[in-house]
Amino acid sequence: MAKLLDIDEVVAEASSIKKDSDLQDVSSDSENHSTAHRLEKIPRDVLVKKRFEDHYRELLGEDYDKFMNYSLSYIRKCIRVNRLKSNVESIKARLSDRWQLEPIPWCSEGFWITYRDGKRFDLGNLMEHHLGYIYVQEAASMIPPVVLDPQPGEVVLDMCAAPGSKTTQIAMYMENSGLLVANDVSGSRLKALGMNMQRCGVNNHVLTMMQEHRFKRIGENHPDFKFDRILVDAPCSGTGTIRKSLKTILMWNPLGITKLSKIQKNLIEIAFNMLKPNGVMVYSTCTIEPEENEAVVSFLLNKYPNAELEYIDDSKLGIKRTPAIKKFKNLEIRPEVENCLRIHPYDNDTEGFFVARIRKKE
């Protein structure tokens, strides 16, 4: 099956869209989480566009100010223990003298991490990171692989994999067995993905560089080749990651969101058609835009009656959620989207994220 994907012509066109959700430790040189400290050099009224504020006040209502206060504050640093090379108890023993670790409820291998003497330390310089014992990964970014729940021996596709935080997490849950196809459209990002897979000891995978239409062609030419599970961590506007990258506000524009929504609908449809009967797909983004989230999922449900949107139980995950957006402007949104997991930065003091779990009914 790995050979089947390898024979396709490699697509050289690089993606112009980067996902902030997978970027490694890019926080400021301060551990101060206050909004005021972060905006010393960039006044808030200069940073935030009026049309951005108008749009989000309409979307969030009275929660807008809370959203902005969290979005303009620093994000807590996190690590995920890589069970392919180490274990939680071993990492605790190695780090506990210098670091304070706070468990992340929804991921048993995840921890918020702070330096005990209060000084800043780049987590990417830790020996445990270089050895692949840990992965520096934002807490909300750990949710999609947990919801996907890949099993050992399965055939799994990560459609937008680079640079690899979720991909290596999937491989860990698969216990390095089965087949993991890790795809991205960017050559430079694929190099980073390959390095992270090697560092983390992943050896059940193949790397592919294909745009989504190539997967569509594979599905048409090889109808018997299907995946047990697929993760579509789609390129998005990243408005849930403002606290990691303030430029997200400056880059925001409605036309770009509409364009991204079209790309996302194409990705989710192609991925759904690559699923085995009773297979599971997780669609996720690091934006809180309903046009990129609930509307994309609704598009799939409208087109495919055998697409079932499964409920993601926040109580089992130990996570707080914001109710799904069921009505916004002229978007066509199905009532079933209440089963999706919508997380705003102020819910759990993380990035904003959206996660949907979809099953292909037989």
Language-model features: locations:
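S-adenosylmethionine
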Residues: 1-362
